[in-house]
From Swiss-Prot:
GO CC annotation: cytoplasm
GO biological process terms, semicolon-separated: protein folding; protein-containing complex assembly; urea metabolic process
Name of the featured protein: Urease accessory protein UreE
Keyword Nucleotide-binding: no
InterPro entries: UreE, UreE_C_dom, UreE_N, UreE_N_sf
Annotated stretches, region: Disordered: 136-173
Bias kind Basic and acidic residues: ranges: 146-173
CDD domains recorded: UreE
Subcellular location: Cytoplasm
Function summary: Involved in urease metallocenter assembly. Binds nickel. Probably functions as a nickel donor during metallocenter assembly.
Gene that this sequence comes from: ureE
C-alpha cells in the first residue's frame, strides 16, 4: 500500500494532486490511518506525530504524488456581537471550555452545540447556523506539533470549570 509520511503546507506545493481527501475537523487530526481519495486512491497516512491537516495542505506519497486535503463543510455557529468587548468576553468563555474556535474577521465560528448556543444567547450574541469548513486556531502549542495542551482536571466534560479544581496546580503559557 502507498504511504504518505510528509505534509506540505498550503501554498508550498503547485503540482496537480493525484487525488483529494475531504475530511471534517476531527478527521483532519491524524497520525496514522488508512484513507481513500475521492478518485479511489488508497493510501496509508503514516506521520511521525499526530497533527492538524489544514485545508489546502497536501500529503506526499512514497512515489512522489500528492494528495490534497480539503476541509469538509460542517454544521457551525457563526457568532457576532455589537462590540469588540462582548466578542472578546465570548471568546474567553469558549476558550475556558477548551472549545476549538475559528476567528473569521469580526466573527467567531464554533461547531454547533445547543448547550453552548444557549449560553451564548445569554451573552447577547447574535448566532447564525451555517454549513462551512471549520478551520479553528491551532492553539498556543500548535507550532510544536500539538493542537492542545496537557493537564489533568480529573474527570470532566468540556463544560464550565475553573482551574482551581485541577488535580495538580498548573499554569497556561
Amino acid at each position: 500500500m502507498l504511504r504518505a509520511s510528509s505534509v506540505l503546507p498550503r501554498g508550498s506545493w503547485h503540482e496537480p494532486a493525484a487525488d483529494v481527501v475531504v475530511l471534517d475537523y476531527d478527521a483532519r487530526h491524524r497520525r496514522r490511518i488508512r484513507m481513500r481519495g475521492v478518485r479511489g486512491l488508497d493510501f496509508l497516512l503514516d506521520l511521525e506525530n499526530a497533527l492538524m491537516l489544514r485545508h489546502g495542505d497536501a500529503v506526499k506519497l512514497d512515489d512522489g504524488r500528492l494528495i490534497e486535503i480539503v476541509a469538509a463543510p460542517e454544521h457551525l455557529v457563526e457568532i457576532t456581537c455589537p462590540d469588540a468587548a462582548k466578542l472578546a468576553k465570548i471568546a474567553w468563555h469558549l476558550g475556558n471550555r477548551h472549545l476549538p474556535v475559528e476567528f473569521a474577521g469580526t466573527k467567531l465560528r464554533i461547531r454547533y452545540d445547543p448547550v453552548i448556543a444557549s449560553m451564548l444567547k445569554n451573552f447577547s450574541a447574535r448566532l447564525r447556523e451555517i454549513e462551512a469548513p471549520f478551520e479553528p486556531e491551532g492553539g498556543a502549542y500548535a507550532g510544536s506539533g500539538q493542537d492542545h495542551h496537557d493537564h489533568s482536571h480529573g474527570e470532566h466534560t468540556q463544560g464550565e470549570h475553573t482551574h482551581d479544581e485541577a488535580a495538580e496546580p498548573h499554569h497556561h503559557g
